[in-house]
Amino acid sequence: ITLSDSVNPNTLTGVHAHKNRVYYWTGTSQNFYYSATVDTFQGNFTKFPVGLVGTFGGNILSINSLSIDGGEGVDDLLAIIMTSGEVLIYSGSNPSSDFALVGTFRIAEPVNEKRGIAKLGGDVIVMTREGYLPLSQVVRQDLIGNKAQAISEKIRGTVISQVKLTGTSTGWQIFVSPDVDKVYFNYPTGDTNDPFNQH
């Protein structure tokens, strides 16, 4: 892998394939890298900066595909989640030609662990300091001026308290069962991890 800005590829910590194109990021900057060709994990990758797109800063924590039905059929979008809680959503399949910014959205600051973000069907669930949010609801509710409701709303106080206690610790993780029948939200309690369950 060769990156266009000469950053050491060994510093890359994240990878995601969207519409057959591979994206890498380091987790310590506001840039991601994309391949000029599809269906390859190697070769030359071009830097794409997003630092001037948002307003709240932060580094790229995760990149995911998000499917949303906008009324004219389902559209597969690229969601870039920043450590600040800002979410940048793009349509298109090639950053060099047809990328278009759908919008920037604000959620509570995510727990600082990539495993606290997971794909669930066409949606993306994010563990934040105020609850566990489905990004599809964030986008839909923002468009009509409402605040998205967390799927953890019934245990909101417990979640907020736990994040205050161990929010900077490792062990935050969303695990979706193989049959997609259950979702487990693991959180660190000190020496071990305990789950909240969603059926």
Q: Where do the protein language model's features map onto the residues?
A:
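A short alpha->loop->secondary-structure connector
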Residues: 1-5, 41-45, 96-102
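Asp-box/WD-like beta-propeller blade repeats and closely related beta-sheet repeat scaffolds
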Residues: 1-19, 50
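Extracytoplasmic beta-rich repeat domains
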Residues: 54-66
